[in-house]
A protein has these predicted regions:
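Terminal, non-globular segments
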Residues: 1-180
Length: 180
């Protein structure tokens, strides 16, 4: 017996059926989440200095990438979020655009193959994607902008843990906005 699967389906060898579902959201959920995250990212560090470790647009990119499970959608969402973040920050245009595009694609690709609904899996994936995102940003700054940047700092570790923890709670809230 042969089973043919489309690109976005996973075959479970134990039970003989696909078990990963693609989540749909109410109209405007993605756009509203994106805009709120980008605006908060721009203004929170101005008023609360400790909020500089947060990367809310990255968390939105990861969540919708893992939930929608379509690499093309994740790629485009990461590009839009990254370029919006670049346009509202003091970074060169494209720095976050490139890094969030890669993360959006990878999150969607992994989301299509793994069940990412468990909080521990979400924490681990968010932490890994955060470190990868920061690595891409540092690589771009070193190679393209010739700016010396350290690879690993204590700030990166703290920011990774804070963003992964916040991500688990944020993802729980965003799960409530799914269509049933």
């Amino acid at each position: 017996m042969r089973v043919k699967l489309s690109m976005n389906e996973t075959y479970d060898l134990r039970f003989g059926e696909s078990h990963i579902e693609v989540h749909k959201f109410h109209a405007g959920t993605i756009l509203a989440s994106l805009l709120i995250a980008v605006v908060l990212q721009s203004f929170l560090p101005v008023y609360i200095s400790k909020a500089g470790v947060l990367d809310l647009p990255l968390l939105i990119t990861i969540y919708f990438g893992l939930s929608r499970r379509n690499p093309s959608t994740g790629l485009l969402l990461g590009t839009v979020i990254g370029l919006l973040q670049d346009s509202l920050s003091k970074t060169p245009l494209g720095l976050f655009g490139i890094s969030k595009t890669i993360i959006g694609y990878l999150a969607s690709s992994i989301g299509a193959r793994l069940d990412t609904e468990h909080p521990a899996a979400r924490f681990a994936l968010t932490a890994a994607f955060f470190v990868l995102h920061q690595g891409i940003v540092i690589l771009i700054q070193k190679l393209l902008l010739a700016q010396p940047q350290p690879w690993f700092t204590m700030r990166l570790l703290v920011a990774c843990l804070v963003n992964a923890t916040l991500g688990v709670f944020l993802y729980y809230f965003l799960d409530r906005l799914r269509k049933s």
